[in-house]
């Protein structure tokens, strides 16, 4: 299959290599021509995925429209807040018959839209049955080394989800399917915010009790928002829900947990972000999800606390005190 992977960060590069090794005809798009030339010359992404050699068959290109026209499947692996701008670059092309697989996890700031909603809004010729999401506990650092990983391909069309499953599945990259793309995208977006909270807990020096509470009550927030927006509760107990939440809150590879940890140690958000060469999606998602939760009337206290610490400069100690001294309630609330 002809597959275009849009976005040459760590995850886009990892998936491009995985698909090329499987025998697909894969072309990886890099936004900046000079970066594309460097990738092609070095046959390795030394900036975002050092040490992973490109298969000879993997081609690199900065030319978006010819790539999209050539492709049968388009994998969008750009940061969530850059998705709209990227796909506007080919919104006039005929996309009939093509499958679009989004792998970026986030909610768009300003609109509150999930990534599949952005795709459908910007690409008027695309129908929901052409769009899928590939989410789950899948750090690029481990997938690129061939370590066992499981994810879920989700689409409103089971046939589309199963096609994505067939295309991506390998002996070490197991792909499940479901049709709850709403639940999958909500879970995959909110978990990054909860991971920032978990990192803050680590940075302060709190113990396992606090971490367990953050993960568990974070799951409750994900579940409430998911249900409000039409997702299915069972999705939250799957790979895109608890699976991705656990790995993002605990892993040393988690950029979102790292941001939180540094905030917990007293550093400013600007200082932390300026020293990172990759995106921590939870920073943007905390603003977008906080605004979305207010718009739809869903109480998300951990999300609110993270937003306040990141963007309103609320002291970490005060945010924690406010969380712990809220009105008492039943666990299911």
Curated annotation (Swiss-Prot):
| UniProt subcellular location | Cytoplasm
**GO cellular-component terms in the record?**
cytosol
This molecule's function is given as: Catalyzes the reduction of the glycolytic intermediate dihydroxyacetone phosphate (DHAP) to sn-glycerol 3-phosphate (G3P), the key precursor for phospholipid synthesis.
Q: What is its EC number?
A: 1.1.1.94
Name a Pfam family for this protein: NAD_Gly3P_dh_C
Q: Which UniProt keywords apply?
A: Cytoplasm, Lipid biosynthesis, Lipid metabolism, NAD, NADP, Nucleotide-binding, Oxidoreductase, Phospholipid biosynthesis, Phospholipid metabolism
Which InterPro entries does the entry link to? 6-PGluconate_DH-like_C_sf (IPR008927), 6PGD_dom2 (IPR013328), G3P_DH_NAD-dep (IPR006168), G3P_DH_NAD-dep_C (IPR006109), G3P_DH_NAD-dep_N (IPR011128), NAD(P)-bd_dom_sf (IPR036291)
Q: Name one molecular function that GO assigns to this entry.
A: glycerol-3-phosphate dehydrogenase [NAD(P)+] activity
Which residues does the record give as NADPH binding sites?
A: 10-11, 31-32, 105, 140, 255, 279, 281
The record's listing under PANTHER family reads:
GLYCEROL-3-PHOSPHATE DEHYDROGENASE, GLYCEROL-3-PHOSPHATE DEHYDROGENASE [NAD(+)] 2, CHLOROPLASTIC
Write down the chemical reaction(s) this protein catalyses.
sn-glycerol 3-phosphate + NAD(+) = dihydroxyacetone phosphate + NADH + H(+); sn-glycerol 3-phosphate + NADP(+) = dihydroxyacetone phosphate + NADPH + H(+)
Q: What is this protein called?
A: Glycerol-3-phosphate dehydrogenase [NAD(P)+]
SUPFAM superfamilies reported for this sequence: 6-phosphogluconate dehydrogenase C-terminal domain-like, NAD(P)-binding Rossmann-fold domains
* Active-site residues from the entry: 191
């Amino acid at each position: 299959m002809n597959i275009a992977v849009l976005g040459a960060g760590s995850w886009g590069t990892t998936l491009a290599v995985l698909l090329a090794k499987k025998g697909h005809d894969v072309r990886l798009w890099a936004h900046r021509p000079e970066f594309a030339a460097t990738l092609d010359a070095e046959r390795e992404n030394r900036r975002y995925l050092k040490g992973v050699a490109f298969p000879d068959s993997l081609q690199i290109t900065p030319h978006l429209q010819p790539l999209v026209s050539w492709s049968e499947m388009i994998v969008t692996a750009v940061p969530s807040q850059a998705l709209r701008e990227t796909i506007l670059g080919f919104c006039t092309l005929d996309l009939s018959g093509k499958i679009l697989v989004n792998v970026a996890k986030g909610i768009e700031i300003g609109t509150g839209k999930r990534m599949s909603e952005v795709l459908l809004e910007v690409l008027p010729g695309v129908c929901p049955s052409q769009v899928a999401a590939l989410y789950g506990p899948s750090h690029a650092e481990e997938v690129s080394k061939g370590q066992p990983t499981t994810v879920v391909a989700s689409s409103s069309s089971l046939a589309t989800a199963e096609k994505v499953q067939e295309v991506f599945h390998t002996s070490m990259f197991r792909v499940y399917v479901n049709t709850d793309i709403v639940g999958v995208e909500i879970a995959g977006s909110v978990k990054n915010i909860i991971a920032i909270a978990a990192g803050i807990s680590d940075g302060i020096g709190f113990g396992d009790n606090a971490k367990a509470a953050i993960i568990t009550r974070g799951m409750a927030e994900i579940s409430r928002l998911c249900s409000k927006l039409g997702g299915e509760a069972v999705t939250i107990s799957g790979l895109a829900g608890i699976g991705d939440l656990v790995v993002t809150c605990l892993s040393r590879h988690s950029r979102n947990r790292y941001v939180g940890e540094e905030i917990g140690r007293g550093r400013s958000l600007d200082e932390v972000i300026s020293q990172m060469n990759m995106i921590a999606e939870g920073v943007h998602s905390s603003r977008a999800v906080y605004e979305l939760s207010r718009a739809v009337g869903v109480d998300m206290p951990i999300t609110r606390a993270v937003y306040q610490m990141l963007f309103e400069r609320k002291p970490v100690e005060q945010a924690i005190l406010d969380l712990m001294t809220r009105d008492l309630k039943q666990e299911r609330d």
